[in-house]
From Swiss-Prot:
Organism: Pachira aquatica
Subunit details: Heterohexadecamer of 8 large chains and 8 small chains; disulfide-linked. The disulfide link is formed within the large subunit homodimers.
Cofactor dependence: Mg(2+)
Lineage: Eukaryota, Viridiplantae, Streptophyta, Embryophyta, Tracheophyta
Family, per entry: Belongs to the RuBisCO large chain family. Type I subfamily.
Cellular component annotations (GO), alphabetically ordered: chloroplast
Alphabetized UniProt keyword annotations: Calvin cycle, Carbon dioxide fixation, Chloroplast, Disulfide bond, Lyase, Magnesium, Metal-binding, Methylation, Monooxygenase, Oxidoreductase, Photorespiration, Photosynthesis, Plastid
This protein's name: Ribulose bisphosphate carboxylase large chain
Posttranslational modification: The disulfide bond which can form in the large chain dimeric partners within the hexadecamer appears to be associated with oxidative stress and protein turnover.
Gene: rbcL
Length: 469
């Protein structure tokens, strides 16, 4: 006999893992899952299955269960609520004991919580909507290399959003031509330029050549403008060793910031790079390439607010967070919800903005949200109002598409931003008077006037796919 109390066979998950009377602990990691069970599967069983399969459970009773304390280690589905307006869809709340997770490892946390359970047959679909990271777990992470305040101090830039530009065409330029475009944009008044996320080290432009020409552009623009400038040098590579080699070379060149694609590169690589950046005084810009594969479907996958929280733990000083007004997906309330999760120290539960749990980040620095994708000078008042000062506004085509060239495109964006910040500080309503503010500024800035003329008809108006219930 394996053990006296052992009874072989399959038993319902809800007998062990559905515990509505459970009182959550301050140290538990809490998860809110949107569960769509298969027909005939009751929500209690579905919620319990999620808790089991993402913690200690498996499909049958095993005698080694008797060798440990399941009550101490199991995940528990402690609350279930139907989703309003949806048939057979439920929000299931699961509590995980902290001992299930390795300290300081987003990789391990995700392997458990969003691992095999997402392929589970009893569920038609499953989406992780939000996580509550307890302070005791948060304190095991370094988090962002520097954070918002240290970045402002390094750059000596206060009281306004920062301006960026992604260099286009994203692929095909030689390193010297690329560096020239960087110089022109920085010289015209931008704070940053950016490697596109898919610029790594391709045959037409090897990484080392790009780094050298971009560094030259930065130093030249700094000398001419008296402002600190940066270019997000993409260190993403095929191996962690190669990624670190690129980051080290960037530091040797004396540039202020590097960049990483954190989802395609992976959380382990990202956390290593973030640690290096803090130790060596480099800022870290994070691109979220591949996020929509994970977060765009409303009933399956993982919401971006979870990916944003994971990034704050893993480490990054900037992250792309949608624009609300440009060409890429992002509903206003939802976007502002995870923008607050990135920047603020303490965020109250607020279901109207998709925030399922109160989150306390204790001592973790904040992350600057980056608005990028299909934005131009006419969007500047809305962006300034929506995102406030602690943000990076990135105009790729909206700089390089200027009819007079790159530097005048940068001038137009800087003038528009300064005009919006000045108007806001004078108490004007950017939402209502935005167009007028831009028109007034364009009277004394021919560069802005030309930009206004080119983009006056451009709109990206489609319904957001991911909306609040």
């Amino acid at each position: 006999k394996a053990s006296v109390g052992f009874k072989a066979g399959v038993k319902e998950y809800k007998l062990t893992y559905y515990t509505p009377e459970y009182e959550v602990k301050d140290t538990d990691i809490l998860a809110a899952f949107r569960v769509t069970p298969q027909p005939g599967v009751p929500p209690e069983e579905a919620g319990a299955a999620v808790a089991a399969e993402s913690s200690t459970g498996t499909w049958t009773t095993v005698w080694t269960d008797g060798l440990t304390s399941l009550d101490r280690y199991k995940g528990r589905c402690y609350h279930i609520e139907p989703v309003a307006g949806e048939e057979n869809q439920y929000i299931c709340y699961v509590a995980y004991p902290l001992d299930l997770f390795e300290e300081g490892s987003v990789t391990n946390m995700f392997t458990s919580i969003v691992g095999n359970v997402f392929g589970f047959k009893a569920l038609r679909a499953l989406r992780l909507e939000d996580l509550r990271i307890p302070t005791s777990y948060t304190k095991t992470f370094q988090g962002p290399p520097h954070g918002i305040q240290v970045e402002r101090d390094k750059l000596n830039k206060y009281g306004r959003p920062l301006l960026g530009c992604t260099i286009k065409p994203k692929l095909g330029l030689s390193a010297k031509n690329y560096g020239r475009a960087v110089y022109e944009c920085l010289r015209g008044g931008l704070d940053f330029t950016k490697d596109d996320e898919n610029v790594n080290s391709q045959p037409f432009m090897r990484w080392r050549d790009r780094f050298v020409f971009c560094a030259e552009a930065i130093y030249k623009a700094q000398a001419e403008t008296g402002e600190i400038k940066g270019h997000y040098l993409n260190a993403t590579a095929g191996t962690c060793e190669e990624m670190m080699k690129r980051a080290i070379f960037a530091r040797e060149l004396g540039v202020p910031i590097v960049m990483h694609d954190y989802l395609t590169g992976g959380f382990t690589a990202n956390t290593s790079l973030a640690h290096y950046c803090r130790d060596n005084g480099l800022l870290l810009h994070i691109h979220r390439a591949m996020h929509a594969v994970i977060d765009r479907q409303k009933n399956h996958g993982m919401h971006f607010r979870v990916l944003a929280k994971a990034l704050r733990l893993s480490g990054g000083d900037h992250i792309h967070a949608g624009t609300v007004v440009g060409k890429l997906e992002g509903e206003r309330d939802i976007t502002l919800g995870f923008v607050d999760l990135l920047r603020d120290d303490f965020i109250e539960k607020d279901r109207s903005r998709g925030i399922y749990f109160t989150q306390d980040w204790v001592s973790l620095p904040g992350v600057l949200p980056v608005a990028s994708g299909g934005i131009h000078v006419w969007h500047m008042p809305a962006l300034t109002e929506i995102f406030g000062d602690d943000s990076v506004l990135q105009f790729g085509g909206g700089t390089l598409g200027h009819p007079w060239g790159n530097a005048p495109g940068a001038v137009a964006n800087r003038v528009a931003l300064e005009a919006c910040v000045k108007a806001r500080n004078e108490g004007r309503d950017l939402a209502r008077e935005g167009n007028e503010i831009i028109r007034e500024a364009s009277k004394w800035s021919p560069e802005l006037a030309a930009a206004c003329e080119v983009w006056k008809e451009i709109k990206f108006e489609f319904q957001a796919v991911d909306t609040l219930d």
